[in-house]
Amino acid sequence: MQEGKISQIIGPVVDVDFPEGQLPSILDALTITRPDGTKLVLETQQHLGEERVRTVAMESTDGLIRGLSVTNTERPIQVPVGPEVLGRMLNVVGDPIDGRGSVHTSKTYSIHRSAPKFDELSTKTEMFETGIKVIDLLEPYSRGGKTGLFGGAGVGKTVLIMELINNIAKQQSGYSVFAGVGERTREGNDLWHEMMESGVIDKTALVFGQMNEPPGARARVALTGLSIAEYFRDEENRDVLLFIDNIFRFTQAGSEVSALLGRMPSAVGYQPTLATEMGELQDRIVSTKKGSVTSVQAIYVPADDLTDPAPATAFAHLDATTVLSRSIAELGIYPAVDPLDSTSRILDPNIVGDDHYDTAQAVKQILQRYKDLQDIIAILGMDELSDEDKLVVSRARKVQRFLSQPFFVAEAFTGLAGKYVKLDETIKGFKEIIAGKHDNLPESAFYLVGTIEEAVQKAKTL
């Protein structure tokens, strides 16, 4: 084993001297045993010359002193992968943090892996059914695609993520991996307990590097989650769902260590390697001929500026965007997805078929017309509208309410049984509303129901 000594410590960045001819390679993991017996992992980032390397620590460097012995593991950070990690909570280096003993797996993967080769990629584009009406109809997710989930605090990002995990686990017997990147520890704790209660924990692996962790952990934890997902795709030929919350923090962590590593800052003070780092992560999230990794990434937009380099770089990789809107959440319509702001690359008649495409466009059209009329309604009231416009408003309000649906993971709050709605049922329901087949039903009949038949049944009880 190659042994070195700490020569300098600046925050999360540690310089280590090695004997001549024993320099670790870039990205090799080094370990330090602290005086109290705990282990600390460093990742090699730069060769500074004169047998010295600069590394980034994966945990706090408190208590380290110059001269401490450092061991080179001679390979990148390895994390446990396999069915044993399901139902467990790990940190960036793969150690369990759920207090339920160690994780014993027969295999480990490096967190730095190359993206699949071109000839291994699956080229067919197919829709990934989520069972959530508003998503399946208006911004369908693609299998192996990447979706950005935009939303402020308290509009339901976490509940939507949990419902997706639940639907994939129950309806499609799929596995999910959740990577909490620079998240609030409280939210991670809530997610863990809610998953235990809703019973989806056995189909999910959780990896956390939270806000209180040093930037090294936050910049690498997304890769840890991705490696676990890649195992299920490549070795078990499964379709896996990967949730990253929040992808902005991945970039933010990179920018925090960038200056300490001596790199010149780029636009807005971000690291010059921003596009490369994002590309290396996103290029691994793909479908191969064996299986797929479909990702949903929550994206924080600093100061609501979509041109900020961090969200702008993430945009380039996305296939679909789901925008959660506070104004819709205030109406009590959940999931609070904005049907006019959300987009999908695969909402194309050649991919989803004419029926789906035409219905989606008709829904958007009627909602847009309603939005245009809202100013007139606010000033003059409904009575001043033409009969044609009154009909548009009435149907649009029914469509708006029919876009809501009771969630399995929110049963405790709504008191309603969760609903998984198949795509053909979704299309049929919206087609009937727009065609005027249900003009005689009250709009409250469409609120928080699954299929159109349920709305008709509900109307009878009102």
From Swiss-Prot:
Cellular compartments annotated: Cell inner membrane
Pfam family, one: ATP-synt_VA_C
Principal EC category: translocase
Domain of life: Bacteria
Keyword vocabulary terms for this entry: ATP synthesis, ATP-binding, Cell inner membrane, Cell membrane, CF(1), Hydrogen ion transport, Ion transport, Membrane, Nucleotide-binding, Translocase, Transport
Catalytic function, reaction form: ATP + H2O + 4 H(+)(in) = ADP + phosphate + 5 H(+)(out)
UniProt xrefs under SUPFAM superfamilies: C-terminal domain of alpha and beta subunits of F1 ATP synthase, N-terminal domain of alpha and beta subunits of F1 ATP synthase, P-loop containing nucleoside triphosphate hydrolases
Sequence positions that bind ATP: G151, G152, A153, G154, V155, G156, K157, T158
Membrane topology listed for this record: Peripheral membrane protein
Family that this chain belongs to: Belongs to the ATPase alpha/beta chains family.
Subunit structure comment from the entry: F-type ATPases have 2 components, CF(1) - the catalytic core - and CF(0) - the membrane proton channel. CF(1) has five subunits: alpha(3), beta(3), gamma(1), delta(1), epsilon(1). CF(0) has four main subunits: a(1), b(1), b'(1) and c(9-12).
Protein known as: ATP synthase subunit beta
Protein's organism: Chlorobium phaeobacteroides (strain DSM 266 / SMG 266 / 2430)
Gene from which the chain derives: atpD
